[in-house]
């Protein structure tokens, strides 16, 4: 079986289990570009700086990179990212370039911060692009991780992680 690089930067033979993946996503760092400045947001933390800059009622970080958390290669990731961007631009939603990276600063995935998107539409975007999880939060509340699966027995007990299945 081929080796793959996980969000934790380690080489593995299989994608991480969902519980492990949730821990990695929750520990990751996320950035949105507004103007010429990057703003940090993280699971379980307030994103007041982002909210001050963008003034939306809700926020979603979504990417099309590495569907099902399996490395897809740069060409396939860029192609999927273009499809996601086109889909988002066809809506009336405001979007800003964003990225996520593991806690060590590697394993970067490019995506979008989508403004004023509802839970259902946000979850549909995640599923349509094969994402195991996305970030979602309402203004004034901490950033939440939304995993697109039922909660497995090995999942962390985290008050900022929602299991949608």
What is the meaning of each model-derived region?
Residues 95-106:
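Short, flexible, solvent-exposed loop/turn segments with mixed acidic/basic and small polar residues
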Residues 83-95, 130-132:
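Structural alpha-beta junctions
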Residues 2-86, 165:
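N-terminal, charge-rich interaction modules
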Residues 147-165:
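A cross-kingdom feature marking charged/low-complexity
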Residues 63, 114-117, 137:
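Short His-Asn-centered micro-motif
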Residues 121-140, 146, 150:
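Helix-rich interaction surfaces within compact, conserved domain-sized segments
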């Amino acid at each position: 079986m081929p080796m793959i690089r996980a969000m934790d930067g380690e080489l593995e033979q299989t994608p991480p289990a969902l519980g492990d993946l949730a821990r990695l996503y929750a520990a990751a760092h996320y950035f949105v570009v507004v103007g010429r400045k990057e703003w940090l947001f993280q699971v379980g933390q307030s994103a007041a700086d982002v909210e001050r800059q963008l003034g939306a009622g809700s926020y979603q970080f979504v990417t099309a990179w590495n569907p099902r958390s399996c490395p897809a290669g740069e060409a396939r990731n860029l192609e999927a990212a273009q499809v996601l961007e086109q889909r988002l631009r066809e809506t009336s939603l405001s979007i800003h370039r964003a990225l996520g990276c593991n806690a060590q600063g590697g394993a970067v995935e490019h995506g979008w911060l989508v403004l004023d998107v509802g839970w259902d539409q946000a979850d549909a975007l995640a599923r349509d692009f094969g994402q195991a999880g996305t970030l979602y939060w309402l203004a004034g509340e901490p950033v939440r991780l939304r995993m697109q699966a039922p909660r497995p027995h090995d999942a962390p007990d985290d008050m900022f992680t929602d299991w949608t299945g």
